[in-house]
């Protein structure tokens, strides 16, 4: 079973979408320079656009790695000003350790251009329809493990 950690960032109007993405990049990279930071910075415009559209309000940005999964939500409007539900604390593990990936929630009508734009900069950063959840490896394995021999079933 995968451990999941959640963080919630204050966005607009507390900080703009670019500043919100910068804060998320700082959390995920723990302030360290490297390939992960470069790839996350390369998609700043696209990620900020999704944050400005309030995509991560109810559907999280999800970072996966060889360790725990990190879900990142954003607060907007009065919730962002108030900040009571915010949790921007540093993580107690390296959120992009080993084989990492980041999935950004995206409105369905923007999915095509967003996926195309992200692909130009990174194969590790993808977009998904914000109305769809994130499949875990256990779910994928379970789906593949179930198969029905229809011929054998009908003969019995």
Curated annotation (Swiss-Prot):
Keywords: Antiviral defense. One of its GO terms (biological process) is defense response to virus. It comes from the Bacteria. Does not seem to be able to assume a closed conformation, does not bind closure peptide. In the Cap7:Cap8 complex only Cap7 binds a closure peptide. Belongs to the bacterial HORMA family. HORMA3 subfamily. CBASS (cyclic oligonucleotide-based antiphage signaling system) provides immunity against bacteriophage. The CD-NTase protein synthesizes cyclic nucleotides in response to infection; these serve as specific second messenger signals. The signals activate a diverse range of effectors, leading to bacterial cell death and thus abortive phage infection. A type III-C(AAA) CBASS system. A member of the CBASS system in this bacteria. It does not seem to bind a closure peptide, its exact function is unknown. Interacts with Cap7 (also called HORMA2) and CdnC; forms CdnD:Cap7:Cap8 (also called CdnD:HORMA2:HORMA3) complexes with stoichiometries of 1:1:1 and 2:1:1. This is CD-NTase-associated protein 8.
């Amino acid at each position: 079973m995968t451990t999941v950690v959640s963080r919630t960032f204050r966005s607009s109007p507390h900080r703009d979408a670019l500043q919100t993405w910068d804060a998320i990049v700082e959390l995920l990279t723990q302030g360290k320079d490297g390939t992960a930071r470069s790839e996350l910075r390369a998609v700043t415009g696209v990620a900020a656009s999704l944050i400005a559209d309030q995509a991560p309000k109810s559907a999280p940005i999800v970072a996966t790695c060889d360790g725990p999964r990190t879900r990142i939500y954003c607060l907007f409007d009065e919730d962002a000003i108030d900040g009571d539900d915010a949790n921007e604390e540093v993580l107690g593990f390296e959120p992009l350790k080993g084989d990492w990936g980041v999935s950004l929630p995206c409105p369905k009508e923007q999915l095509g251009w967003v996926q195309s734009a992200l692909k130009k900069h990174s194969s590790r950063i993808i977009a998904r329809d914000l109305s769809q959840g994130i499949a875990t490896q256990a779910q994928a394995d379970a789906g593949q493990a179930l198969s029905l021999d229809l011929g054998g079933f009908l003969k019995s």
